[in-house]
C-alpha cells in the first residue's frame, strides 16, 4: 500500500450533531475535505455517487470545483452507476472536470448497487432495454463512454463539419490520459477478472459478494490476484491499480475519543468483526471497523492481506461531522500510510 485517500458518502441531514445540514453544506464541505486532505499530505479525495437520496449525486460540477481548489490530490468517484448516464454527455463533463483539475480524475464506475428508487434509471429516461440485463446495459454504456473519452471519432460529420473525408467527429473537449484512469467497482471474482481483461483499474469496497468464512482481507486479496492475472494475460500496458475501502477510526485526542470511543469498547468486547450477510440477494462478507490508536491500527492493517496488496487505501469517513473534525483524522491517516509503506 502506497497511497491513502478518503471516501466521503456525502450525506447531509438535520439530525442532532450533524455539521452538514443541507445540500449546500455538503457541497462546500466536500470541497473543504479535499483541501484538508491535500494539506494533510493525503493522496486522494473520493466521493460516493447515489441518486434519490440525501447525499452527493451529480459528480462532475463538484469534482471540477474540488480540482479548482486543490493542486495535487487525486479526485475520484466511488462509484458512478452507469445506468443513469448518457455516456457521451458524461464524456464531455468528465473531460471538462479533468482538464480543470490538471488531469487528476480517477473515475470509478459500475452497474450500481441497491438504491431507493424502484427504477431510477428509467425515471431518468434510460429504461432497461427489453432482453437486456442491468449488467449488460451498464457494460454497453461503459464501453461507449471509454470510446468517447479516448478521442476517437464517433459521430458522422454533417455538411458543415471541418474534418477530413472519411473521418468522424470526436467528443470535445478531449482530456489526454483520462481513458487510462477509469476504475470499476467489482463485487466478486468474475467481475474482477472481467475488469482486468478490459483494462480498467479495480475498486473493491468494504464488502465482497462471497462468503467463505475467511476474513474480508483474505477473500479480497484473492480477488485482487485474479484481477492482476487477467490484466497481465490480456497484455495491457501500464500498471493495474487496485483500491480497497476500509472503515478506520483513529483515536488521537479527546475529540476523537468522544466520537470513536464507543466503537473501541465494542472492539474490546469482541463485537467488532467481519460479518456475513446478504445484499442484493447475494451472500456477502462485510468488513469490520478498524478503531484505536495508531499502533493498534498499524498492527491490524498489516494483517489485512488486501490492504497490503492494494496500492490505494480509501478510508470511509464520517462526513457529517464536517471538514474541521475530519482534518484531525487526516493527519493520522497520512502517518498510517508512512508506517504501512515501510
Which role fits each region the language model picked out?
Residues 44-66, 81, 206-217, 316-325:
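Glycine-rich, proline-tolerant flexible connector loops at the mouths of alpha/beta enzymes
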Residues 10-28, 80-88, 176-186, 284-295:
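Active-site mouth loops of central-metabolism enzymes
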Residues 4, 41, 49, 66, ...:
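Conserved, mostly hydrophobic/aromatic
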Residues 1-23, 84-154, 210:
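Flexible, glycine-rich active-site loops centered on histidine and acidic residues
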Residues 188-211, 215-216:
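A conserved active-site cap/scaffold subdomain adjacent to cofactor or substrate pockets
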